[in-house]
A protein has these predicted regions:
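Amphipathic alpha-helical packing elements
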Residues: 48, 53-97
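Short, solvent-exposed polar/charged micro-motifs at secondary-structure junctions
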Residues: 31-32, 54-62, 134-144
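Amphipathic, interaction-prone secondary-structure segments
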Residues: 27-56
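Short acidic DE-rich linear segments
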Residues: 150-153
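Alpha-helix boundary/N-cap detector
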Residues: 3, 21-28, 70-74, 78-86, ...
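Generic structural signal of hydrophobic/aromatic residues within well-ordered alpha-helices
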Residues: 12, 33, 83, 87-91, ...
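Amphipathic alpha-helical binding modules
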Residues: 91-148
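Long, hydrophobic N-terminal alpha-helical segment
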Residues: 1-27, 33-34
Length: 153
């Protein structure tokens, strides 16, 4: 995955939460980050919803969210556009999915027991991953790794 700090505007990086090599944004910033990434020629490398607190983080769900691989007949700019369109569609499905919303509420209730006064909107972040044309990424391998991590917890 690519380091977004090398490509994205400073104002978008300033509103991100960074932990290690991962950058995360709030829901309100997602479309702007997607648009800026597309303009820079960065493809979506997937994403994960997390509750982030000073004490740690908790994934909203263990399902992997990765766009499809680049097709042989697809140019890089075409793939970049498609990867972000698939990502936007996945975001919308997540926001419309009542089961996921309920899971988030259950997780957040546990977090609130240890973090007094914390509001859900202040803790919900979306970790985004990026790819460049120079990277050859095996999405199926990523999915297996992410799902095995989820199954082990």
């Amino acid at each position: 995955m690519e380091e977004p700090g090398l490509f994205l505007p400073a104002d978008l990086l300033a509103c991100a939460s960074r932990r290690g090599d991962e950058y995360a944004w709030r829901k309100k910033d997602l479309l702007e980050v997607a648009a800026a990434s597309e303009l820079e020629g960065l493809a979506s490398g997937g994403w994960q919803a997390q509750f982030r607190t000073p004490d740690g983080e908790c994934a909203l769900c263990w399902k992997s969210f990765y766009p499809g691989e680049q097709k042989d007949v697809e140019s890089w700019p075409e793939y970049v556009g498609r990867s972000w369109e698939e990502t936007r569609q996945m975001w919308q499905k997540l926001f419309d999915n009542e089961d996921m919303v309920d899971e988030g509420r259950r997780i957040f209730r546990l977090i609130q027991q240890t973090e007094d006064g914390l509001l859900p909107r202040d803790a919900l972040w979306f970790v985004l991953y990026f790819r460049t044309s120079a990277q050859k990424c095996n999405v199926e391998k990523q999915n297996v790794v992410m799902e095995s991590m989820g199954n082990g917890l």
